[in-house]
Amino acid sequence: MSDKELIGLAAEARAASYCPYSDISVGAALLCDDGTIFTGANIENASFSPTVCAERVALFSAVHAGKRGFVAIAIVGGPVGEPPSKLFAPCGVCRQALSEFSDGNLRVIMTDGDSVTVKTLGEMIPLGFTSDSF
């Protein structure tokens, strides 16, 4: 699957966002090593701490389905009803969650609508805390 196709699926996933507080919808598409794709959208909550980011919705859906190998995740975000206009990178909690189930080679694909930026998870969370830290 191409980066562009994965970005398209992340953009489609934004439609399922529940974001009445920020008015920012985010979609994610996670590519598993067997070609399966899981999508997610952010789900907000009035008390904020229970809010779940799109990346974790996709990741936890994949893990719940028994997947453990991941190749790439695409993230697309912006104000509800508008095309993406800036990069949305995974927050620290999402980076940590992704690192639990992938090595530093997971490709993180982000777009501002005009250009695409690709980083590895290792670049985004250097010296990350993993099970090897025990």
Regions found by a protein language model. Name each.
Residues 10, 28-29, 58, 62:
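Small-residue (primarily alanine) positions within well-ordered alpha-helices
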Residues 22:
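Active-site segments that bind and position negatively charged phosphate/pyrophosphate groups
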Residues 39-134:
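Zn2+-dependent cytidine deaminase-like catalytic core
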